[in-house]
Amino acid sequence: MDYRRLGSSDLEVSDISLGSWLTFAGGVGFEQTRACTDAAFEAGINFFDTANVYGRGAAESAWGEILSGRPRDSYVLATKVWGQMSDDPADSGLSAAQIAKQIDASLTRLRTDYVDLYQAHRFDPGVPIEETIEAFQQVVDSGKARYLGFSEWTTEQVQAAIDLAGPELFVSSQPQYSMLWRAPEAELFALSTANGISQIVWSPLGQGVLTGKYRPGQAPPSDSRAANSDMNVAMNRLMDDDVLEAVDRLRPIADQAGLSMAELALAWVLRRPEVASAIVGASRPEQVHANAKASGIRLTPDVLAAIEDALGDTPVTEPTLATNARPGVTHR
């Protein structure tokens, strides 16, 4: 397993990390979740990413129980705030009160005194950015988080935060990024790098599409994410036949390189020095081990060129935000 420095922090994180949205929110049982987590440690993964909203606290609680049996300095733990945590729509967002309330609740569920990385899950344009930034800084000043990050912010929002608090405010950005979704390359990568911010990318396997498990003209496997109505909300475009046909053209490229489709997709993401870690989900331990094999793979220029030829104009390249992200900045 290779490790990379997370932005301007002193954290060294595995370039393959384990996320908990698929593992915990996808209905995977506790013992299977424990097995996936154990497999991650066996593979050298030391970076674990969750969020308060995953299962409305269930994901954090599960990892709190599982990870509490290991030395706290043996892993890097990240969580997020923003999502709606109850039936009350007001129980969400990035107000000072909500951030203060949710960090304490997250730490209780995670059974730890601090998280290594506390992230804004989305931007909240309904709250003055000054209030949000001051609240996040208070979390760090109180020792409840070591570093801060954000997910799915526009460059306008990132720049506004940096203008207020300086480039040392954030160490990480968490955008969607894969062969099929390249939106962060347009603007976010350059702004982040200029300010000491690394990328922790989610959905590097394109919601599983880049593993090759879905074929054009065929129904998705019954046990797959695409067949689960609770999990496939963001997959509509990815399941179009033209996208699946483009992904099918990657199959001989992976075969010739001696790689699985997943290894090819993860290595493609990790080719970028801006990326500190690629977050993968898992419902079975063998998936964790299989994805971890992508660490350290270097794709040749010929392979990279073949990928571009195969995908053509299929990937999203314009600066576009993922689901639920909102543009705009509010000031006091």
Tell what function each PLM region has.
Residues 6, 18, 33, 40, ...:
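Conserved, mostly hydrophobic/aromatic
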Residues 21, 51-53, 80-84, 120-123, ...:
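Active-site beta-loop-alpha junctions enriched in small/polar residues
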